[in-house]
């Protein structure tokens, strides 16, 4: 399998921009590109899919605490592609705590045996770039930097200085650069990049970006590097796929709700269940289904439109009152509350839970955690350890009883504990995002609620 991993020295270096440009340039050459993203991010994967036409897959060694399973998923998705391109997260060695192998990009590179291309920010730097590359190349004896791409380069002369320094003081080849160009900048807001669903003229941006990469990066050399990764010897755990043939699962999918891991959706399909997308923004009612799944997204951006769609509120409430299982994550929790408040405005939501979501100006929760149900819930049985992550600016103010204890640990130490998660009847909602492949029995438990 041909494969490369695009990493960086830190967040904000332009890793995503360079990755998207490479994906576009490779696709323009006629190659089938399979995209991957290290970590739990949903927005970057949507960009990947927009460019390649192929669903991007998250590789997260915290959410899936099984190296063999991660490697098997990587192999499965990449086997039919001409090249697999993995976008890293944060800095190459950044993860959970100070262990360079704990939930980091470098760990995924080693787990998948993928050559690393390091993106270095060229803004206001020249010879010092060589020190960065040399330090990263020496830091982990089990990992070698196979090439470097310089981002935000001011001129050809500027690039020559950086390239000359790196190749004089290190043995890492410089594959090229991306010049400074405001036309390819990706807009950001409170949860990172603005989702593709809310942007216009993306095709033009991708064309410009891909052409810049094709002009200034040695893609032939990059493709040669992609062939140097060792072959994976995969021994995945045996997977018992439950049979839910005939089951209908309605899941919210539109500009307001689109945070889903592709592997989660694929596994639901593998059970024989039928996935039926619906739009809380556009449609009047939930499709006829046995189970309702409302993922995360940006309900706050579309609060007015969501509030006006009263018939959808009534349809979801009716499903809840009939005892149909409803599972909601983050933005889904906000939607199932009684209202959403921001900027002195209040917007009526579905009202399954008596609670108000309030937008704030800072991150309220950020990062990985372990959830433990305090009683049997739709998400899991009492005492089950459930891996997940939270990332939100809102708070949910409610008198509803919490159903989970959540713990954040770092380097073996507990750094934070809190409670969350709400269940009423067969409806469960929390800020937690989860990956089913941590424990595939979760689906059997959740779908089993239809019969309970």
From Swiss-Prot:
Pathway: Cofactor biosynthesis; adenosylcobalamin biosynthesis; cob(II)yrinate a,c-diamide from sirohydrochlorin (anaerobic route): step 10/10
Active site: 330 (nucleophile)
Swiss-Prot/TrEMBL catalytic activity: cob(II)yrinate + 2 L-glutamine + 2 ATP + 2 H2O = cob(II)yrinate a,c diamide + 2 L-glutamate + 2 ADP + 2 phosphate + 2 H(+)
Keyword Nucleotide-binding on entry: yes
EC number: 6.3.5.11
Keywords linked to the UniProt accession: ATP-binding, Cobalamin biosynthesis, Glutamine amidotransferase, Ligase, Magnesium, Nucleotide-binding
GO MF annotations in UniProt: ATP binding; cobyrinic acid a,c-diamide synthase activity
Superkingdom classification of source: Bacteria
GO biological process: cobalamin biosynthetic process
Database matches in InterPro entries: CbiA/CobB_synth, Class_I_gatase-like, CobQ/CobB/MinD/ParA_Nub-bd_dom, GATase_3, P-loop_NTPase
Site (Increases nucleophilicity of active site Cys): 433
Top class in the EC scheme: ligase
Cofactors that this protein relies on: Mg(2+)
Domain GATase cobBQ-type: 248-441
Function: Catalyzes the ATP-dependent amidation of the two carboxylate groups at positions a and c of cobyrinate, using either L-glutamine or ammonia as the nitrogen source.
Note: The a and c carboxylates of cobyrinate are activated for nucleophilic attack via formation of a phosphorylated intermediate by ATP. CbiA catalyzes first the amidation of the c-carboxylate, and then that of the a-carboxylate.
Protein family: Belongs to the CobB/CbiA family.
Domain notes: Comprises of two domains. The C-terminal domain contains the binding site for glutamine and catalyzes the hydrolysis of this substrate to glutamate and ammonia. The N-terminal domain is anticipated to bind ATP and cobyrinate and catalyzes the ultimate synthesis of the diamide product. The ammonia produced via the glutaminase domain is probably translocated to the adjacent domain via a molecular tunnel, where it reacts with an activated intermediate.
Annotated PANTHER family: COBYRINATE A,C-DIAMIDE SYNTHASE
Record's protein name: Cobyrinate a,c-diamide synthase
